[in-house]
Amino acid sequence: MGKDEPGRQDLPKSATKASATPCSAIVCTVLDPLAKVLGIFNRFASRGIAAVSFHHQLKKSSLCLFLLTLILLAGTFRSALDAEATEPKRPNILFLFADDWGRYASIYADANGAGGINDVVRTPNFDRIARSGVLFRNAHVNAPSCTPCRSSLLSGQYFWRTGRGAILRGAIWDETIPAYPLLLKDSGYHIGKTYKVWSPGSPADAPYGGQKFSYQKSGGRFNQFSQNVTKLIGQGVSPDDAKEQLYGEIRGNFATFLEARPVDQPFCYWFGPTNVHRSWTKGSGKNLWGIDPDQLKGKMPAYLPDVPEVREDLADYFGEIAAWDAGIGVLLKHLEESGELDNTLIVISGDHGAPGFPHGKCNLYGFGTGVSLAISGPGVNGGRIVDDFVNLTDLAPTFLEAASVPVPEVMTGRSLWPVLKSEASGLVDPKRTWVVTGRERHVEIARADYSPYPQRAIHTANHLLIVNFRPERWPLGDPYRLDGDDVPTAEEITNSTRVTHPDEDAGPTKAWLVGVRNSPEWKSHYDWVYGKRPKYELYDRRKDPHETKNVADDPAYADVRAALEEQLLTELKRTGDPRMIDDGVYFETPPLAGPLSDEATFWEKPAKNKKK
């Protein structure tokens, strides 16, 4: 955050307390006349009228001292009251953060134009916050993998600066790294969380105080939404009543958190359901939400095969997004009923793109790193759509600034308050025209030698440049068992991520594409998704918005590639990325690579995988 950026003192008057208090008025009424008496007494004394006996002079001096003390106390008390009266009230912070939710919301169809897959998504509650606040069209995560993304968000730093928080499997949190939730707690905030904050990793949810501030005794069935609702329906419960049972758990957890809050203490609450993360019940998008897969026909981007199997899989994913949005609605309603809505900063986003789809999770394409982001609340000049490039590392300094908590110097994120307070739409801050993303290790056994797949990228409005530092490796993991006699079945690939290409989540889309890998029609598509990639990938987003045509070797783009690479590498070096030091040895050796260490908890250690 720049030193010249505005702080909480610039919040609008609507977020402040009343300018005068009854107590202050009483103090002034009682003590102001005493001050006048002292003034009159001193005038008489100066004329010799009070020049009597020494005894009388002593009494006069004592009275003067007493009155002077009262006046000084009154002035101090009044100054304190006036300062308190004009100090802005610190806002509550409600952060709603979904697992595996990219930039898919119905309002993005309105903002970007119809014709794409967002035409089919239904997110009325997210849309409500986006319309009342600011909708960001170019928000990206720093890493398209759960733990490193969350490490960067919670610390306000690039993921490569978070030690073992930079990887997924085998991650361990470094408690010396400042995390915004604990900084807010130390400043007087009542903090709490429900469901996932930081995991997999050890200790789980460490940057939020572990389970000390957990509120989820009302239940966690929402995290397997389609499975649990389908199960209840099978037991004779109506679809609406089945959903309401799960919504009730969300409501109960939030209510318990609010009830535990001391009077007049601002709160910071994190809602992190995992239902959008695979797996989902097949057909649930249509059965539970009325999302017809055929609605997606002709709308699929080039990297998603426009076939029935993939369309149904995507419709089921959108069904979980609809459930997530319904959960948002439950929290907003309860917040409004509690009387806290107007003084609550509401931020809604997700930790990366779609899981188990080409170009999605674990990829640096826009479909993998681009996420939804809407911000509304006190101090936010709403009703705008913003094109500034935002990294979710920017949220930590934004939260701290809202709470008047000093932002640690180590944070590389920049506060969004200059953008949030602006009245402009489109590009607000001319310096926010790019973001940097990257990844290292996701699943530890993705490659037989336990190595990562190191990538860094720079995203701009016109171009995407990706640098693959180890192009000899398989980007989504080794093609285990695909060339031998023990070829995995479609069911295995659908249900087990580690069977083959372990850096892509298991699911029907992955199973279908692997299944047609040798067909004349789809072999090139399979190779393009799972095959080895060149060191440089450059996409002209103006001509190729889906980022499918690599022009890195096109002489016409030589200057663009050189300029973007220099800009990217400069930022990596400026922020101390270990990948830039000694050929990245830090990320290539244990504990950042190699088998999981003994420090990993038992639930982090995978079952043995048969590799060929």
PLM regions and their residue ranges:
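Intrinsic-disorder-associated, low-complexity terminal segments enriched in Asp/Asn/His/Tyr and depleted
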Residues: D4, D10, D32, N42, ...
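Short alpha-helix boundary/capping segments
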Residues: L11-C23
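Formylglycine-dependent sulfatase
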Residues: L67, G75-E537, P545-E566, T570, ...
